[in-house]
A protein has these predicted regions:
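Surface-exposed, low-hydrophobicity interaction/linker segments
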Residues: 48-125
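Phenylalanine-focused residue identity feature
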Residues: 25, 31, 75, 82-85, ...
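Acidic, proline/glycine-rich low-complexity IDRs
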Residues: 113-163
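Short, flexible beta-strand-to-coil junctions
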Residues: 32, 39-45, 85-87, 126-128, ...
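N-terminal leader/presequence regions that precede the main folded/catalytic core
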Residues: 5-8
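N-terminal interaction modules that seed assembly of large macromolecular complexes
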Residues: 12-70
Length: 163
């Protein structure tokens, strides 16, 4: 099976109106060569193709195809967890675990930060239409996103301020 690599997980949070999901995915190395499981889907596309793809319990999609859809229409996401997997991880393997979720998940607000799905390397989360969270095993992805977005805040620091 897989060895879980959970050391060095880092996260950041940013107001939804200060960035886009595309910017988050652009910071994940080789995202176009990954697969993505989208769960807890609540979004408002007007494009028929996108609406039909997202009107499901979960969506398994190649990173390159997801980027094409997000560039086709910049629509609002209320809830959604985008779990990113290397190409060698299959949908059958992914579905052996519970679906990641955003609405009601308290793990975002606790330290240490972790990726929900044990086989995923990164997660981007649309949270309540207000925030986007980027959580990754690769600090570089989060650091790059934070450098590009001055409004992004380290998620562990954000959580400490809530206490």
């Amino acid at each position: 099976m897989y060895t879980l690599r959970r050391t060095g997980v880092k996260g950041c949070i940013i107001n939804y109106d200060k960035t886009s999901l595309i910017e988050g995915f652009d910071c994940i190395n080789d995202f176009d060569k990954c697969n993505c499981l989208i769960t807890n889907i609540e979004c408002c596309p007007t494009d028929r193709e996108i609406s039909e793809i997202m009107d499901v319990e979960y969506c398994w999609i190649e990173g390159k195809e997801l980027m094409r859809l997000l560039k086709k229409e910049d629509f609002q996401w209320i809830w959604g967890v985008f779990s990113v997997f290397p190409k060698n991880v299959t949908l059958d393997e992914v579905l052996k675990y519970d679906y990641p979720y955003a609405d009601g998940y308290t793990g975002f607000w606790k330290s240490p930060i972790s990726v929900q799905h044990p086989l995923a390397v990164s997660e981007i989360v649309a949270w309540d239409g207000m925030y986007i969270l980027l959580i990754a095993e690769n600090d570089e992805s989060v650091n790059t996103f934070m450098k590009k977005n001055i409004f992004a805040k380290d998620l562990e620091e954000y959580n400490r301020e809530l206490i």
